[in-house]
Every structure is written in C-alpha cells, then in structure tokens.
Regions:
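C-terminal beta-signal and adjacent terminal beta-strands/loops
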Residues: 151, 251-263, 286-346
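Outer-membrane beta-barrel translocator domains and adjoining extracellular loop/strand segments
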Residues: 46-54, 96-102, 109-110, 153-161, ...
Length: 346
C-alpha cells in the first residue's frame, strides 16, 4: 500500500501475516461434544514515513507472535435442548492510518485526525455460556451470558487544537464487558400467517475501563460499546411464487464515540463525545421470474432519524452542588437509500 502527496502526509507500509491452526473434535457419548484448537499467528507491520511536520523520518517494524486458544463444549440435554460453553482469545490490530503519524482532515467531523505510532495490539479473552432450544424446524430460542476482558483496548480520543478538534487513537490499560443476550426465531404459521417468521436479538451489556491508580480518568464505559442493542425483523418467504421480503428494525444505546481529556478539576474536563440512540428501519423485496431473472428492491434507513453526537458536561459549583449540561457537537440525517436491481443467471 502506498499513499503520497507531501512528506508530512505520505508513507509506505506493508504487513505480513502467517498463521497455522491445530484443532480436534472430541465426542463423549452421544450428548457431550468438544471442539478445541489453537491458532498461531506471526504478524509484522512495517511503515516508513515522516513526522506530522514532514521533517523527521519515522520507521516502524512491529513484530508479534501470538497463540489464540479456543474451546467450545456442547451438551445435548435432549433432541431440542442444548447447553453450550465457549472460550476464545482474539486480537484487534491497529489499521495503517491509526499508526502513521501524519495528519489528515475529516470533512464530516470538520476536524483533523492523526495516527499514533505507539499504538499496540489489543487482545480480548471471551467467555460465553448459552442455552439453546429448538422447538420446531427453523425455529430457535437461545439465552446466553458472556464476559470479555480486554488488554490494551484501542479507543479513539480527541483534544482541542487551536480553533478546532484533533482526533487520534490510544490504548487504554484494561477493560471488561459482561452481559446477557437473547436470540429468537419463530414461525407465525400457528396464527395463519404462513411463510412469515419473526426474528429478534437483544442484549444488555455492561462495560468498564480500568485505569492506572492515581490517574485523572474516572469510571466510564468502553468507547464504542452500547449498553444495549435491539434487532428485530419480519421475514416472508413464498418459494412457489419466488417471493421473499423482510422488514428489519435496529436500535443501539448511547455509546462513547471519542474519549475526551479528564483533568484533576472536573470543571476543566474535555468531556467524552457520545453517539446518541437512534432507530433504523430497512425494507427489502425480491421476486424470481423463471429460473434466470430476479428483481430486487430495497429501502435502507426508512425513518431517516438524526445521527446525533453530544457531550454531557459535569460541573461542580462553589457550594459543592453538581449539575450536568448537555450540548450538541454535531448532527445530520443520513438520508434514505432506495435501490432497485435485476440479476440474471446464465
């Protein structure tokens, strides 16, 4: 990959990823099954560029060798009931533009973004326990609980720079998330709505970032993590007529988009920027004509709800009274996307 304009915003970079995987499937009778494995990865990120002022050469040659174990155990209580437990380790590696030291302008935010050459890989240990119930063909209900522990999670941060803002990236020390999740798929044939099914997914998530002792940072959620999410959909399928359609709803909870700068005096904080909750609704339709032609149509984000980013400024007055001021950072409507297409099979 190569991007070039001037020294201050040009760089040459490459990465090398080598991997090997070993796995085994173990069966203990007809009820208990286990899949265990480990993935070994070698990763090398190289970058040659210049500092943000274009005068000092910068060279990166980051090499890591990692092992990622995974275990998945399932126990069949009966033909329709299953209990599953799983553990796995994963990695989130910085992207090129997150580590290169040059500054580029983001027109949507009206702000500069600069990479961080000190950014490290982020690792996560994931643990999940889930109960699964399959009442009929094509139907399911699952209830699960999960826990994730992060080492060096990558977060986007921002600070005031002159008359505007400047965004960059950093590693928090540690973080953890845990929560519960519900998945359901149910046919509506039982109320006379043949071919129609309801799908729902909902989760509650609690997340917290851990800081060094004595640091000015205060207890807060992990950036990018919503406290809840809801997905629901109606799906229609008529194989004889070649018709399929879906109506999908989505909502996410308030989440941190960019981490601010905490101070010892809370009144001087540069507060976090939050992405506010919004509702979205998508509609899709397709019709097969013969064996070769299919007509497709869709409407994305039918509600065209505002995307809003806000700060919640916490203040303490001279008498020790506390109050919070809400202020809008930016907002816009993404627009409704309507598409129609025809596909041919030869």
């Amino acid at each position: 990959m190569r991007e070039t304009t001037t020294n201050s915003d040009s760089y040459t970079s490459e990465n090398i990823l080598g991997a090997a995987y070993v796995s085994a499937k173990l069966n203990y009778g007809e009820a208990l099954n286990a899949n265990i494995g480990v993935r070994m990865e070698y990763y090398n990120l190289k970058m040659d560029g210049y500092s943000s002022d274009g005068t000092t050469p910068v060279h990166l040659d980051n090499r890591t060798s990692d092992f990622f174990p995974s275990v998945n155990i399932s126990y069949n209580l009966s033909a329709k009931h299953l209990v599953r437990a799983a553990y796995g380790r994963s990695v989130n590696r910085p992207e090129f533009r997150e580590v290169v030291p040059y500054v580029y302008f983001n027109f949507e935010r009206d702000a500069n973004i600069v990479g961080n050459t000190e950014l490290k890989n982020a690792y996560a240990d994931n643990l999940e326990v889930r109960y699964e119930f399959y009442p009929a063909s094509g139907e399911m209900i699952t209830i699960g609980a999960f826990y994730k522990r992060f080492k060096d999670p990558i977060e986007e941060t921002y600070n005031e720079a002159g008359s505007g803002l400047q965004y960059t990236y950093h590693n928090a020390k540690n973080a953890e998330t845990f929560g519960i999740e519900l998945d359901m798929k149910k046919s509506l044939d039982f109320i006379g709505l043949r071919g129609l099914s309801l799908v729902c997914n909902a989760a509650y998530i609690h997340s917290r970032v851990r800081f060094e002792e004595g640091a000015p940072e205060r207890d807060r959620p992990l950036a990018g993590q919503s406290p809840y999410l809801v997905n629901a959909g109606l799906f229609y399928q008529h194989d004889d007529k070649g018709i399929s359609a879906s109506l999908l709803y989505n909502r996410i909870g308030k989440r941190i988009e960019s981490v601010g700068v905490p101070m010892q005096d809370q009144n001087e904080d540069i507060p976090d920027i939050y992405e506010m909750p919004r509702n979205s609704l998508d509609l899709t339709f397709s019709k097969k004509i013969g064996k070769a032609v299919e007509i497709k149509a869709g409407i994305q984000d039918m509600l065209n709800s505002k995307i809003e980013y806000k700060q919640f400024v916490k203040l303490t007055d001279k008498n020790g009274g506390k109050r919070e001021r809400e202020q809008l950072v930016r907002s816009y409507r993404p627009g409704v996307d309507i598409n129609v297409g025809v596909s041919l099979k030869f």
